[in-house]
Amino acid sequence: SHKPIFQILVEKLGRLVTLAKEAGGPKAFLPFLVMTSPMTHKQTVDFFEKHSFFGMPKDDVWFFAQGVMPCLTPEGKIILESAGVMASNPDGNGGVYPALKKSGCLDRLRSLGVKSVHCFSVDNPLCRPADPRFVGYCLSKNADCGNKCVWKATPQEKVGVMARKGGKPSVVE
């Protein structure tokens, strides 16, 4: 497909809303929360606006910026972007939770009665946002969180794996 990844994901969410409506349940509310980096925030918002939010109601697409952290050398020294200005980079996927809180999105979700969220990386076009079977399974097990993953293709593949670290489930790189 030559569609932008955001369009693919919005279309998948739209199909879920349609399926819920056809099933006769309550009106489905599936906002699309898009975490950006401070460096890409404006371009991402502009991209959605340029494409009329890919047909999704504008009020159902929420943008929030992840945090940043200082750039360090391997020796732990701060890297400067320019004289007197510390270089920084986005704080990664783990930054989603503090960013949801800081942005006000978490409070907004709570005020709307949202009880569950599905976090996924935007660079995965195979992702099934709010996958009803997966979400339903997690809810049926009263799970605080769930994680879908696949086996590594080879032992040498450089991807994180699910493992216990310090007795807790973790993604180990």
Protein language model annotation of sequence segments:
Residues S1-E173:
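Domain-scale recognition of functional cores that engage charged ligands
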